[in-house]
């Protein structure tokens, strides 16, 4: 006849082993879930917002700043982009501009509103800046202020639409949203802001 005490000890040991296994399984699954969450967060969709600089002044001829209409458009751009994400307190993470006054003055109201610096890029090497943005800002929102000839080129460099229509010399109201998912096809959306362009 078996000793009742030994059966109880065996049952207790078995229960402890089961409990230990359950805890180990929970810890392993939690670690896997945390790793997967980190992976998917680090691979999140990158959004690049491209705009052409706002309306430029006629003087000085060399490197004009913005006209009054351009300053109003830049202020409207800032108003729209301050809360670019639906999550409160989340918006544009970085702002890039060429070194031309009209581009910097277009970017400044957004930079001031978000307390971000305006980072300069070389207008003659659009491929380098688009590569750098994709590498450095994965899962972020970036504003890039360019020119009528560089915006379509940079959008194409991102692997997005190569069919962006030519931007007219008097056309300043386009916002191009390029979304680069960690998996899937890069998309381009064109929106309008400020006073509409009338051809």
Language model: regions and residue ranges:
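Conserved alpha/beta-hydrolase "nucleophile elbow" surrounding the catalytic nucleophile
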Residues: 147
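Active-site-proximal alpha-helix that buttresses catalytic centers in soluble enzyme cores
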Residues: 2-39, 43-137, 150-199
């Amino acid at each position: 006849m078996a000793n009742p005490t030994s059966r109880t000890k065996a049952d207790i040991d078995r229960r402890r082993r089961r409990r230990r296994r359950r805890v180990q399984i929970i810890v392993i699954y939690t670690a896997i879930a945390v790793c997967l969450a980190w992976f998917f967060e680090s691979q999140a969709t990158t959004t690049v917002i491209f705009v052409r600089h706002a309306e430029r002044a006629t003087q000085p001829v060399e490197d004009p700043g913005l006209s009054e209409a351009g300053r109003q458009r830049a202020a409207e751009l800032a108003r729209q982009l301050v809360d670019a994400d639906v999550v409160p307190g989340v918006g544009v993470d970085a702002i890039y501009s060429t070194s031309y006054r009209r581009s910097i003055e277009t970017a400044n109201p957004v930079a001031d509103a978000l307390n971000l610096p305006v980072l300069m890029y070389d207008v003659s090497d659009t491929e380098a800046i688009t590569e750098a943005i994709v590498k450095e800002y994965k899962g972020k929102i970036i504003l890039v202020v360019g020119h009528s000839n560089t915006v379509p080129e940079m959008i194409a460099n991102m692997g997005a639409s190569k069919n962006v229509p030519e931007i007219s010399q008097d056309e300043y109201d386009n916002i191009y949203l390029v979304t680069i998912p960690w998996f899937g096809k890069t998309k381009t959306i064109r929106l309008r802001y400020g006073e509409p362009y009338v051809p």
